[in-house]
């Protein structure tokens, strides 16, 4: 799948989703937000509504089977958002194909365990972090848990939760662009 896309389902964690979208755009990434529904309106876990760039039908029209390590599929956490993503079969099939084609994947909070670990041994042997309480789900799928704010393992980036959303997004930006771009965006958040 060519490009960078962040996927939204009702119940998404607002801080994780919006911080990631914003930081990637500040870094010059042409990231598109995608609703898994047939309309672009999604509602977060705390009632915030968002209109995505694309709905699922619009994404289907532009999907490519090619992928490179700088093409990312991104999954915010939140419940029941992560569960809703994991239960949407066409998205899970696309994720599996994207990973197999060499594309990058990023997930934060509950999504490493609920979305990624749901694909069986697809991510077995890799190192991830997740929201507290989901560690056993990772380990049951053969995934190595690491307690950290953000973990990068090759073309896989995971984040622990909303308190680490900025670190997570900057890690993705460093993978897609480079560390200098991520550092420049990060520097813009700190007063001199």
Language-model segment annotations:
Residues 152:
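Cytochrome P450 catalytic-domain "roof"
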């Amino acid at each position: 799948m060519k490009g960078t896309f962040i996927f939204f389902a009702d119940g998404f964690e607002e801080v994780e989703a919006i911080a990631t979208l914003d930081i990637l755009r500040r870094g010059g990434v042409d990231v598109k937000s995608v609703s898994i529904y047939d309309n672009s309106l999604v509602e977060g876990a705390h009632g915030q509504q968002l209109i995505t760039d694309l709905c699922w039908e619009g994404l289907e029209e532009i999907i490519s089977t090619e992928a490179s390590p700088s093409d990312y599929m991104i999954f915010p956490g939140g419940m029941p958002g992560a569960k809703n993503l994991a239960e949407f079969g066409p998205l899970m099939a696309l994720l599996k194909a994207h990973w197999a084609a060499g594309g990058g994947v990023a997930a934060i909070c509950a999504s490493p365990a609920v979305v990624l670990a749901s694909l069986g041994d697809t991510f077995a042997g890799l190192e991830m972090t997740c929201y507290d309480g989901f560690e056993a789900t990772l380990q049951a799928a053969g995934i190595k848990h690491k307690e950290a704010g953000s973990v990068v393992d090759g073309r896989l980036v995971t984040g622990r939760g909303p308190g680490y959303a900025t670190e997570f997004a900057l890690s993705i930006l460093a993978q897609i662009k480079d560390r200098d771009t991520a550092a420049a965006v990060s520097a813009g958040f700190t007063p001199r």
